């Protein structure tokens, strides 16, 4: 059980517990021919990525943050009554692996060590690695025709960015339907962990959204767009990865449960460089943020309030800027905004390299990539303590420290 009640009550309060997912087998499956489909800009030097991720985890632990690793949580979940069946029942559906092979794969999976099964569920399983003779000839045919390039289970390298497939919002969690096909099956694994792992199965928290077998339709939500900032306010980016269908349902559920006082939507352009709100804006302290103005200044705010009619919520379209609307909601005069550093060219490069995607360990202390020298210097000049980590490989899927952490226990801050 967690030492503190589960829940995330701010973006910058003292961080007590996070989930991460270290680079591993899934990244070893990346090739020049499949990396774009799997949402990576290039293949990784995996050993270097592992080293820098381990350094990241060590830095978090040095500040007394409990770091939970997804591979280990998944392994322990597979050993619980119901956990293994829950995952395999879905993963081995005909629509996921093709007709006629799920039963034999299940038997094979149940004979292998649990740690190996957990590794394959994240790392992927090529047809070429399945024992010959399984699958009534189907697997042998796929192996013969496609060789190592065809997967029975697709690798999930974007689990490295643990922020996205679930999001803790105050006293509960949203299990997020992901926008891109390469990430669709991530949420199944976190759903299993939160429902079956002993750490969570007996804990006191609510599922705000997604703990159902209902197909999401056009609804998409990703955790990099979701920020519970305090006073019951939730920011939600709505751009490349999060849709109105997802935002509106999440807001409705939060209001129905009395879990939010307002949801402030950041309507953004649908661009990869700013795929989530946290790629252009993160919090440094209660009244201090880092932002990429070229995008943040164009955000259109939409504010949803608990309903005063038969509608699921009331809708407000403010005329102020997004940051002005957020500051007003928190009851502060204005944010101190530290913009992406360097000239026009350097700022564009550093934003692309996640300069504005920092994660707060506590108020005024953040983890940032070492490559973003101009922005980090500006943060330090503004009184922010910047803990730098290696970045050459970790950012190839477009995510920094904020993306690589799923906070589970974080304190509130005073406003």
Swiss-Prot record:
Q: Which transformation does this protein catalyse, written as a reaction?
A: L-arginine + H2O = L-citrulline + NH4(+)
Write out the annotated subcellular location: Cytoplasm
Pathway, per UniProt? Amino-acid degradation; L-arginine degradation via ADI pathway; carbamoyl phosphate from L-arginine: step 1/2
Question: Could you say which enzyme class this protein belongs to?
Answer: hydrolase
- Key word Cytoplasm present: yes
**What's its EC?**
3.5.3.6
Q: Name one GO molecular function term.
A: arginine deiminase activity
Record GO biological process: arginine catabolic process to ornithine; arginine deiminase pathway
Q: Which InterPro entries match?
A: Arg_deiminase
Q: What Pfam families does the database record attribute to this sequence? A: ADI
Q: What keywords were assigned to this record? A: Arginine metabolism, Cytoplasm, Hydrolase
Establish whether keyword Transmembrane is in the entry.
no
Q: Where is the active site?
A: 403 (amidino-cysteine intermediate)
Q: Which GO terms describe its cellular component?
A: cytoplasm
Protein family: Belongs to the arginine deiminase family.
Could you identify this protein by its name? Arginine deiminase
Q: Which gene encodes it?
A: arcA
